[in-house]
Amino acid sequence: MAANLFAPSAYTAALLLYLQKNRFLLPLNNVLEMGIGSGVLLASALQLGARQATGVDIENAAVEATRALLIQEGLVSRAQLGQGDLWSAAVVQGQTFDFIISNLPQFACERVPVDGHLPSWSAGGTDGRDLMNPFLSGLHRYLSKNGRAVITHNVFLDFESTQQLIGKNHMTARVAQSVSVPLPSNKLNCMNPHTLKRYNGHGVKQVGGNWFVDFDVLEITWS
């Protein structure tokens, strides 16, 4: 059941493609995935040559789903997993990471029950930044000197707001790839209607009864 709760999404697929295209970055590196979900990205990083990997999720079900996947793939000996709230998780304390991956909940919606998903699914608060802001604010303490973070970043988050936030800690972001994906009805129905209206025609598209939303894969490095 836990594995179904965290089924990989189009956002996962975009990060997976990034890992595959940039596999030269992974060998010998210490990798962190913040918000592991199904564990697919963490397992893929190890398969592509990461020396070791750490995974964090606030949901214990995600930690257990990831552990099961790593055991299945014969990778668990090179990984450490922990339940926790972003950077407060015990498993990341005292560490820095060469490569950090993250696909955090980032839609402008609150924690509500959705069929087939936990209440935390996609819930980024009124502006979508409830998790993104503390993640980005703490990133500089855990990213190694020559390290790189790669994250999904949808249109609701506003790229300039992210640049300003990480710029305070001498970091910068660039768009590595852009994707447009269907916006399913269960996600659409839980979104802040004012935010949805604001971005309609500006990263959100409606064609008949179909909705689509744009997101980027961002690379974050030291400036």
Task: Please give the residue ranges for each predicted region.
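Conserved SAM/SAH cofactor-binding pocket of Class I
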Residues: Y11-Q93, F99-S102, F107-P113
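Mobile active-site "lid"/loop adjacent to the S-adenosyl-L-methionine
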Residues: I101-P134
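Conserved Class I SAM-dependent methyltransferase catalytic core
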Residues: R129-K187
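Class I S-adenosyl-L-methionine
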Residues: M171-L218
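Active-site beta-strand termini and strand-to-loop segments that position acidic
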Residues: I220-S223
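Class I SAM-dependent methyltransferase Rossmann-like catalytic core
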Residues: M1-S9
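Glycine-rich, phosphate-binding/catalytic loops in enzymes
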Residues: G49, G116-P119, G167-K168
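Short alpha-helical
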Residues: A7, V40, N60-A61, D130, ...
